[in-house]
Each structure stands twice: as structure tokens, then as C-alpha cells.
Design a protein with these regions (language model features):
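Feature of extramembrane
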Residues: 1-172, 183-188, 335-345, 350-650, ...
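Membrane-embedded transmembrane helical bundles of large multi-pass transporters/channels
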Residues: 1-33, 95, 126-373, 600, ...
Length: 826
């Protein structure tokens, strides 16, 4: 610190130059967050492998639904505007496989709402946002059109984040100014923290942007709102701690430089411990798999930038302004003690066991009995003023969500799968999936509208064979008729009397005789012709029947699938259309859409997905799919992967964060016991606040639970803030214990730090509350959990539980060492 004070001007100028250059050349962090901050599971999960599988074969994995709201019911005979609109969509580059309600009658019944006023038009595409923009630019819409899919919802969330960030920044600055004016009663003081923290925010945003662009640093759309809330909150807390300490040191020293030095030697050490703990705590998040979680490391980067500016620019400001920092307050050099916290400390130390018992008796049941519901439905993230959410609300109202967001299955093989055998096995697999509980239906090549194609069923084809046999019988009848005619005409010629009579007539009338013989020959010829035609029909019928029966007998899968798919059927026009719709890569990839009876965002849908996976694994043996790669996509699959990833990451991060924080605190505190109860107090606070928040969201606000990312971010942020406040108090306790006994040192520390901690808590609660202005449900839920946690920690844990534990342990607080060395009071 002496070096910094000695070279304060060169160091400050250098820091300012670095900050200015970084701001000039830094990429746009908001834009980078939109481009690279997609919320998705790791690449190793099935839902991402599904995406990559389709991209590798040149197929589009994104499906957009255009929801058309009509004023008048749609007619089955057609609607010119709707048909024109669909034709215009088909012309757009990047749009494939548009499913029109007029494809056939079955499709019309399936996709059009019961009142026939709502039509979802589904299409596949590569770039959802670009395609959506082009669709919105089509001039003649048949009604109100809303477009939706995961990408479009995310795009709208990004837009909402940008708007919310601007509001959050304004509200945060206003709250800090108001609170600091009240606390310090000074015109100058409030602007010092704002300057330091504002500069830190800009500097850290620039550094993170560089890291994202050039080092593939993890980023998300939430990083900037969190940076605003936390840097302004934590930074202001640190400034308050240092400014309050500076008040004390100014009263004790006439020299401003000496006062600044003592401030940073004592208070600065506390800040350094807090900042280092936060940084390493956030650094371990890099070991998580989920990129959204890993983006929280940016907060650690922000804290480092904050410390750099606080240790370089703030000392210069303090030396330059001195007591004028607190102008016009006349009591600038007095520091008022918090008597209320002193009384709480006295109470908890005298009745330590009772205080600990009461707090645990209240908090542990709250943790155990309150619900812990996590929802993966991000459709409530923003309001339905955005088109993607409006479309989802219409789908929820008019249709089943399971139909709109099916589980998608992709089966890939080195060999062609769209063969007779392959499609028969596909139908067998489809039948098994269709029997699973909570599966509403399956769409694939053999059942494009959810029901098996009638012409493919073996029963239907046996009926065709019966018709062929009937045809053959008619042919045999023709043969019999022809032979009968020949016999009738030839038989008289075999009788001698008749022959003699005809010969006699011929001699008397030669011309008549010739005519009679000619007639006989003609009749004989016709009879032979009938016989020949009948015989050909019989032969053709026999060949056709033999071909069908031979094919069926050689296809082992007919009994399982109930289908026999001949080569002629594969060449059928309608069949080719179905193959094109549900296959890719020239038949090496086949697709299935599994519609669920459940909400695809629910956890119960995850169980159904697991049942589908188990069924497919069991049924693929003995089929052409036994060596195929099978991956699962769709909302349910993605959320199931997120669920597994989040649970794994939460466990991993809690262990690593606790371990690293413990080691850092052991080094600074020179104690094993003190870090343990510090971390325990924070974890119990987190779980209590989560329990209360779940009750609030479930019963009071009508939500279906806490959104998936809220628990994680609430944990890591509350952990960091709680550690800060505990360090504030216990560091001062370690100072005071050098000149007092444990009881008096504790009471003195609480009196000295009570106002600082309460003020810091009010400020951080205010900055976090500013997240409510963002309009984003995730940020509002995180804000609620954090505010609950901060209130619980600063009303019950820090002033009651921690002092009670400290008093109970006595000298054991510093085990295995003896604690700080005693020295005489100055």
C-alpha cells in the first residue's frame, strides 16, 4: 500500500489509460451474449447430439410454428388467403416441409382447432430468426400471425433483457444515491462509490467481452444484469466499509496519507479477503458443464476489476479530498456505533445454546417440509406482448402442448433404412412406443398423420389378394364357357348322320354349305379365344398372388408390424411424400415425432421420455436398427438433459465452492472451525430462503415453481454475499480480540460493524430489487430468493446465530491455533 500511495499519480494515470483503451476497442458484450449465450445442454447430451446429427446430414432440426388466428372459421374446401400465405412461406429460402392444413382431410382435422379459427402451420428451417423476419414481411396475412419455437422465444428474451438492463441500471444508480445520501448526509460521499463502481462495471464488461470473443469465455444474457446488481451492490458495500473506516482513521490521525494507509491496512485487508474469496468461489464454476452456469465466472472477473480500481483510484481520491469527502456533514470524523447490534450480540452470547437451538428448530423444518419445485417452462419468462410467447399461449388454449412440442427421435445408420424391411421394423418400433403410458400418438413414415397407412397393413393387402382370387375365378369361368361352346359346336360334327345330312345339303347348295362351315369355324375360334383370355387371367392372377405371398412369407417382421411394404408401394407418390417428410440423407436417417399427453415441460414428461428410451433400446434388437445411432430431440429431451446437467453441476459446484472457500478462509483466518460455521450459516440460509420462495411462487404468485437457473445463481451469489458479511464481522472481531476478551471483543465488533453491515445489506437489497424492473421472471425469482436470504442472514444469522456460536466455542474458534496475539490497547 505504501508503494501505491507513493506512486499514486503514475499508477492512477496508467489504470485510467488501460480502462479507456479497453472501452474503445472492446466488442459489444450484449451482442456477443445474444450470439453465443444460447441456453442449451452440453454437447455430450442426447438432445445436442440430435441437433448435430441432423446438421451433419444437411437436415434442418428447427421447427417453426406459425399460428394463424382467423376471424371466420376455416372451410375444408379451401381458403384463398391461407393457401396464398402458405405458398409465400414455401418460397422463402431456408424453409422446408411446410405442413399445410389442406394436405389431406386427416391433416385438416389434426392441425385445425375445434372452432376452425386457429391454424398452426409447421415448417422446418435452419435459421429461425431470419425466416421469422421474412414471414412477418409477407404482405397479405390471412389473419393475425404469431411465430414461435425455442429460438424465437430466446430471441425475444434477449430483447427483453436489453430493455430490462437499461431500467435496472437507472433504478440501481438512483437507489444507491438515495441510500448513500441518507447514510452519510453528504453531497460528495454518494458519488465516490458510484464513480468507482461505475468505472469497474464498464472496465469488467470490456474485459469479459475480450475474453468471450478471443478466448471462448462462457457468456449468457444474464451476465450484464448480474454485473450491474452485484458490482454496484458489492462495490458500494466495500466503499462504505472503507469510507467508514476512513472516518475513524481521520479522527485518529492528522495526516490524510497516514489515515488512508491505515484504512487500507485494516479495512483494505478485509476487502481483499472478501474479493479473493468471491473470485475463487466463482472461478470453480468453470468446472461446471452448463455454459449458462459457467458464464457466472464473469462476476469473478468483475470483482477483480473492482479491486484493481479500488486499490489504485480510491486512495488517490481519499488523499486529495480528505475530510471534504463527507462535506457538508459536520460530524464527518465521528463514527456512530450500532447499539442495537451490541444488544443482540450481548443477548446471543449470554444465551448462546438457547439461541442456536431456537434458530435450528425454526429453520430445519422449513428446509425439510417446504416444497422444492423446479420448472423448465421458460414460456413464462417474459410477457405475452412478445409474439413467440403469444403464439405459445394460443397453442396452450386451443391445442395440446404435447402435440405442438413432441419428443423427436432420429435414427441414423450406414445403410438405407427406407427399405421394405426398414419401414416394417420402423412400424414395429412405433407400435411399441404408442403403447407407452402418456404417449398420445406417433408420427413417422408409416403413419404420417398418427394412424397407420391403411394400404400398408397386411390385412388390407390380403383383402386385395382375395379380390385377385375373385378375378381368377372369373377367368376360369370364361375358360369353361369357351370350352362349352366348342363342345356344343364340335359335337354335332362327330355324329355320322348329321355329317351325311350336311354333306348332302352342301352338294345341293354349295354356297349354303360353305356358310354353315364358316359359322361353325367362327364359333370355334371365339370359344378358343375365350379360353385363352381366361387362361391368361388365371396365370396373371396366380403370379401376382404368388409374388405377394412369397414377399410376406420372407418378411419376418410382418407378424410384428402388421405391415408388408412392397417395392411397388415404396414407389407410390403418397408414400414418397411421407418418406421425404420423415427421413433424411437419402434414407439413412429416419425420424419419429412422439406426441405426449402431458405438458412437455413437466418433470412427469421426463419419466415418459425415459420409458420411450428404454422401449426403443429393448425393441431395436433383432431389427435393422440394432447398430443404428439413436438420439432424442425436442423440448422434453432438452429439458431432461438440462435437469441432469443442473443437478450434477449443483452438487459439483457446492462441493468445490465450499472446499475452495474453506481453504481460502483457513489461510486468512488461520482457523479450521471459523470457516466451517461461516459456510454452514450461509448454506442453511440459502435452503431456508429457497423453501420460503417456493411457497411464495407456488401459492401466492401462482407460478409452477422456480425456474431452472434460479437456484444455482441464487446459491453462488448468496454464498458470496454472505461470506462478505461474515468476513466483515469476524475480521473486526479478530482485531478487537487482541485488546479485549472474547465477549467484549464480540460486542465491540458488532457495535462497530453493525451500521456498516446493515447499510451494506440495504444497498445490496436495493440493487438486487432493481432486477424486478427487468420484467424477466428468472431475474425476478433470483431477486426474491436473494432478498429473502439477505434478510434472514442479516436479521437472524449474523446478529444472533454467529455470535452464539462464537461465544459457545470460545478459544476453539481458532482451533488448531491459539488465536490472535494479545496486545495493549492504543
Amino acid at each position: 500500500m505504501k508503494t501505491i500511495l507513493r506512486f499514486k499519480w503514475p499508477i492512477s494515470i496508467l489504470v485510467i489509460i488501460v480502462i479507456v483503451l479497453s472501452l474503445i476497442f472492446a466488442p459489444n458484450l450484449s451482442q456477443l451474449a445474444k450470439e453465443k449465450g444460447e441456453i442449451k445442454p452440453p454437447d455430450s447430451t442426447s438432445s445436442q447430439k440430435y441437433e448435430h446429427m441432423l446438421k451433419d446430414v444437411g437436415a434442418n432440426s428447427n421447427s417453426i410454428v406459425a399460428v394463424i388466428k382467423m376471424k371466420e372459421p376455416l372451410s375444408e374446401q379451401g381458403n384463398d388467403k391461407v393457401e396464398h400465405f402458405i405458398k409465400e412461406i414455401k418460397k422463402i429460402d431456408g424453409v422446408n416441409q411446410v405442413i399445410s392444413p389442406y394436405t389431406n382431410k386427416d391433416t385438416f382435422k389434426k392441425v385445425v382447432s375445434k372452432d376452425k379459427k386457429t391454424i398452426p402451420v409447421e415448417m422446418t428451417t435452419g435459421d429461425s430468426v431470419k425466416v421469422a423476419d421474412k414471414i412477418n414481411k409477407i404482405d397479405d396475412h390471412p389473419g393475425k400471425v404469431y411465430l414461435t419455437n425455442n429460438d424465437l422465444v430466446t430471441h425475444d428474451i434477449n430483447k427483453a433483457t436489453d430493455k430490462g438492463l437499461q431500467k435496472t441500471e437507472i433504478v440501481t444508480v438512483a437507489l444507491i444515491l438515495i441510500i448513500l445520501f441518507v447514510v452519510f448526509r453528504s453531497v460528495v460521499t454518494p458519488f465516490i462509490p458510484l464513480f468507482i463502481v461505475g468505472l469497474s462495471y464498464l472496465f469488467s464488461s470490456a474485459i469479459i467481452a475480450f475474453l468471450v470473443k478471443y478466448c471462448d469465455f462462457p457468456v449468457s444474457v444474464y451476465i450484464q444484469p448480474f454485473l450491474v446488481a452485484l458490482l454496484f451492490g458489492i462495490g458500494t458495500d466495500y466503499c462504505i466499509l472503507l469510507l467508514n473506516r476512513y472516518k475513524e482513521e481521520l479522527a485518529a490521525h492528522d495526516d490524510k496519507t497516514k489515515a488512508v494507509y491505515e484504512t487500507f491496512v485494516s479495512g483494505g485487508k478485509t476487502i481483499l479477503i472478501c474479493g479473493s474469496t468471491i473470485f475463487v468461489s466463482f472461478l470453480v464454476i468453470l468446472f461446471a458443464q452448463f455454459d449458462l452456469f459457467r458464464s457466472a465466472v464473469g462476476i469473478g472477473v468483475g470483482v477483480v476489476c473492482l479491486l484493481i480500481i479500488m486499490y489504485t483510484l480510491l486512495p488517490l481520491i481519499m488523499v486529495l479530498l480528505g475530510e471534504k469527502i463527507f462535506w457538508p456533514s459536520k460530524k464527518a470524523t465521528s463514527h456512530k456505533e450500532n447499539r442495537f447490534w451490541g444488544k443482540l450480540g450481548n443477548l446471543s452470547s449470554k444465551h448462546a445454546f438457547v439461541v442456536i437451538l431456537v434458530i435450528l428448530a425454526v429453520f430445519l423444518p422449513l428446509i425439510y417440509f417446504t416444497p422444492n419445485k423446479i420448472t423448465y417452462d421458460n414460456t413464462n419468462e417474459i410477457s405475452n406482448h412478445y409474439g413467440s410467447v403469444k403464439a405459445l399461449d394460443i397453442i396452450k388454449d386451443k391445442f395440446e402442448l404435447g402435440e405442438a412440442f413432441p419428443v423427436t427421435i432420429a435414427i441414423k445408420d450406414n445403410d438405407k433404412l427406407t427399405t421394405s424391411k426398414g419401414l416394417s421394423d420402423l412400424e414395429t418400433l412405433t407400435k411399441s412406443i404408442n403403447k407407452i403410458d402418456n404417449v398420445k400418438g406417433v408420427n413417422t413414415i408409416t403413419r404420417p398423420t398418427g394412424t397407420p397407412i391403411k394400404q400398408l397393413s397386411a390385412t388390407n393387402q390380403l383383402n386385395e389378394i382375395q379380390q385377385q382370387l375373385t378375378k381368377a375365378n372369373k377367368g376360369l369361368g370364361q375358360v369353361n364357357n369357351g370350352l362349352g361352346t366348342m363342345q356344343q359346336k364340335v359335337q354335332p360334327l362327330t355324329q355320322s348322320q348329321v355329317v351325311q345330312q350336311q354333306m348332302q345339303q352342301a352338294s345341293q347348295n354349295p354356297q349354303a354349305g360353305v356358310q354353315s362351315i364358316t359359322q361353325q369355324a367362327s364359333q370355334l375360334s371365339q370359344g378358343l379365344q375365350q379360353a385363352q383370355q381366361g387362361n391368361e387371367q388365371v396365370i396373371d392372377g396366380q403370379k401376382e398372388i404368388q409374388s405377394y405371398l412369397k414377399g410376406m412369407s420372407q418378411d419376418d417382421s410382418v407378424n410384428r408390424s402388421g405391415m408388408y411394404i412392397s417395392q411397388d408401394m415404396l414407389n407410390n407418390k403418397d408414400m414418397k411424400r411421407s418418406i421425404d417428410q420423415y427421413s433424411a440423407n437419402h434414407g439413412n436417417v429416419v425420424l419419429l415425432n412422439v406426441e405426449l399427453k402431458q405438458n412437455p415441460y413437466s418433470k412427469s414428461a421426463f419419466k415418459t421420455l425415459n420409458n420411450i428410451k428404454n422401449t426403443v433400446d429393448n425393441q431395436k434388437n433383432g431389427t435393422v436398427f440394432k447398430n443404428s445411432k439413436i438420439e432424442y430431440g425436442g423440448v422434453t429431451s432438452q429439458n431432461a438433459d438440462l435437469d441432469h446437467t443442473i443437478n450434477t453441476d449443483m452438487t459439483k459446484v457446492i462441493i468445490l465452492m465450499s472446499l475452495v472457500t474453506f481453504l481460502v478462509l483457513v489461510v486468512f483466518k488461520r482457523s479450521i472451525i471459523m470457516p466451517l460455521y461461516m459456510m454452514f450459516s450461509i448454506l442453511i440460509t440459502y435452503y431456508v430462503s429457497m423453501g420460503i420462495a417456493n411457497v411464495l411462487f407456488d401459492y401466492s404468485f401462482g407460478e409452477k415453481g422456480v425456474l431452472l437457473v434460479a437456484p444455482f445463481f441464487s446459491l453462488v451469489i448468496l454464498f458470496s454475499l454472505g461470506i462478505d458479511y461474515a468476513i466483515f464481522l469476524l475480521n473486526r472481531f479478530n482485531e478487537e480480540v487482541r485488546t479485549h476478551d472474547i465477549h467484549n471483543a464480540l460486542i465491540t465488533a458488532m457495535k462497530k460493524m453493525g451500521t456498516v453491515i446493515v447499510t451494506a445489506c440495504i444497498i445490496i437489497v436495493g440493487t438486487i430489487a432493481a432486477l424486478y424492473t427487468s420484467g424477466m421472471l428468472t431475474l425476478m425469482q433470483i431477486a426474491t430468493i436473494l432478498i429473502l436470504g439477505l434478510l434472514i442472514y442479516n436479521l437472524f444469522i449474523l446478529p444472533l446465530f454467529i455470535p452464539a456460536v462464537v461465544s459457545t466455542l470460545g478459544k476453539g474458534n481458532w482451533w488448531p491455533l491459539k488465536g490472535p496475539k494479545k496486545q495493549q490497547h492504543k
